[in-house]
């Protein structure tokens, strides 16, 4: 399972002109399930993402996770958006292949599991809409962007 995480000052996702999720400072996570992924990969990826230290401490060092973004125990927002194109195979030709991505059914199941687990573990979770054409806007803070991956079993 893959997550492209970005530290943001704010982010929003809309579907057909309707806002489905919006956060202030926090993390925007573009999430993708790969063939062979299970709930175990989703849970490991979420645990890594929530504890990944990408926010600056009082000394300006990247040392704080989204769960304690300000160093005083206050969490930042988490906006989770499905994006199957993260699993694209771009090694040959000029058209990406999406064979490495999970099937739509498995992708939806794992995305929904990821979101449910995120909501159980983090107080500020917003989402996009699985399978929809979405418009994602963000103000990247840094910019700070990381690619996290837990390989399929």
Curated annotation (Swiss-Prot):
Keywords: Cytoplasm, Hydrolase, RNA-binding, tRNA-binding
GO biological process, one term: D-amino acid catabolic process
CDD domains hit by this protein: Dtyr_deacylase (cd00563)
Reaction(s) catalysed (UniProt annotation): glycyl-tRNA(Ala) + H2O = tRNA(Ala) + glycine + H(+); a D-aminoacyl-tRNA + H2O = a tRNA + a D-alpha-amino acid + H(+)
One function term, GO molecular function aspect: tRNA binding
Pfam families: Tyr_Deacylase
Keyword Hydrolase: yes
GO cellular component: cytoplasm
Sequence motif Gly-cisPro motif, important for rejection of L-amino acids, residues: 142-143
Subcellular location field: Cytoplasm
NADP recorded as keyword: no
Purpose of the protein: An aminoacyl-tRNA editing enzyme that deacylates mischarged D-aminoacyl-tRNAs. Also deacylates mischarged glycyl-tRNA(Ala), protecting cells against glycine mischarging by AlaRS. Acts via tRNA-based rather than protein-based catalysis; rejects L-amino acids rather than detecting D-amino acids in the active site. By recycling D-aminoacyl-tRNA to D-amino acids and free tRNA molecules, this enzyme counteracts the toxicity associated with the formation of D-aminoacyl-tRNA entities in vivo and helps enforce protein L-homochirality.
SUBUNIT field: Homodimer.
Protein name: D-aminoacyl-tRNA deacylase
Species for this entry: Cupriavidus taiwanensis (strain DSM 17343 / BCRC 17206 / CCUG 44338 / CIP 107171 / LMG 19424 / R1) (Ralstonia taiwanensis (strain LMG 19424))
The gene coding this protein: dtd
